[in-house]
Amino acid sequence: WPGLRDRDPNRTPMAWTPARNGGFSTAPDPLLVLPPITAPGYDYRVVNVEVQKQLPGSLLNWHRRMLTCRRLLPALRHGSFRLLHSPHPGVLLYLRCTEAMTVLVAANVTAAGASLSLDLSEWAGERTREVMWGCEFPLAAAEWFVNLPPYGFNWWLIGEVEPGATPA
């Protein structure tokens, strides 16, 4: 943020509304410890909780969706952990499992996109669903091709869903 030094941008209060000072304070500017952020693309009058709540694709709603999925899928919270071999050096692959469900996690930890082939022969014929948005995938086959954006990840539910655990 232009004009803010060190860690000051991290200490700036969250903007709640497009109101004066982001709805955080009605104090006049000289009494504020840090000014509200007005940099293009980050202006508190545009980027604030009130506006973000209304935008389905906002970062706020994306995080809410991710936390909802985690809450609804017990395997992501307390399932067993099994590290899988990754054919791509920048992609971490692992499983989180309970007796009733298996979640496959792929996380690209690099600044470049990653393409890889996954061996799903262990789950051939199982129903497969992308967790965050609930998109059904073709039944698991021996091999899947996956593309992940830079620092991207995906969660797939493999097999049957526990009752009441459908995040879509």
Located regions from the model:
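Carbohydrate-interacting/catalytic domains
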Residues: W1-A168
